[in-house]
Amino acid sequence: MRQLAPYALIYLLAIACAAGLATQSQAADAPLQVPIGYLGYRPDPGPLLSNVIPEPADAGLRGAELAIIDSNSTGRFLNHNYSLASASVDSPEALLIAAKAQHEQGLRLFVVNAPASSLRQLSAALPDSLLFNAGSPDDSLRTTDCLANVLHSLPSRAMLADALAQFLVIRKWQRVLLIVGPTADDQAYAAALRRAAKRFGLRLVAEKPWSFDNDQRRSAQADMPLFTQTAEYDAVLVADERGDFGEYVPYQTWYPRPVAGTQGLTPVGWHKTVETYGAAQLQKRFEALAGRWMNDRDFAAWIAVRSIASAVSKLRQTEPMAIRALEISDQLPLDGFKGRKLSYRPWNGQLRQPIPIVQPRALVSTSPQDGFLHPFNEMDSLGYDKPEVSCRFP
């Protein structure tokens, strides 16, 4: 019996080792879970003076959903599993509550489609998380109010205005009339247009505030020619983000000139008419999912989730600040179906990207335009460059 004791001990040790190896194997086989939160809040714009087609209520969310599907199609080969927890609310208070609830569930990566004020609140409330701004084009978030835990996948107003100004310069439409709407967003867009005009050599022959409160559906043909009667211009720039009057400016100006800005010839982050470099496949997948066209907020949310997935694939982890550090490095070129590799600017967290210039049914051009050079990256000719930004990240 005593002779059997050593063999019994060896047998028990073998069983214990096998059990340990089995446990390790099961742990190794467990997929890396990558939960992402989507937080949506779009303020009610109030009554409009035109019958403008409203933005889809699910703009942004559908782009994030498609990106989760795309990320899982490749992530399964790496044993990564992506999931989306979404909350679309009707007030900034409800948005903050939803964000904290998702945070308590363990989420640390978020895509936010909300105004700048809400983004600032979320950034302060979730300091250990990484937020992707897919909803606010506010320039102050990229120049003076930069948030250390926020990256911007939506183009800034400055990027849009610079993209348009480059195209106007190329076409030699350098004398412009600027019409500015009454809202704070209109004023911000107009400020971006003024900056772009000065930067690229456009000349403002006149600037007019829009002060009418009547329905232009009935009176545009009578009002607009007189309103736009100034010194001669090559183009009319419109700053009307809500769509109160801008749709009625084209074809009604005193001089027969193109209209551009928020209406007419428009710089956008994304549009249905973007089809090259594989974009047509993205458009088809989105339309099959959402039953509508993909817009700029959808694309911003899509590329935000894809940015996370690309970083996780390389890092094999989900730590927010490690992801942020990789995103703003030059080690993570992103494919955004825009003909160039995209990346985030380290000085303000803005996604570098070409900007399509479109009319409602066609792609007209894409900026940066040929000839507008930059010592580091031509896409940095759009928006605020490093010397123009006062942000200092830790």
Regions inferred by a protein language model and the residue ranges of each:
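Extracytosolic ligand-binding ectodomains
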Residues: R2-Y7, T23-P394
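Bacterial N-terminal signal peptides
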Residues: A8-G20
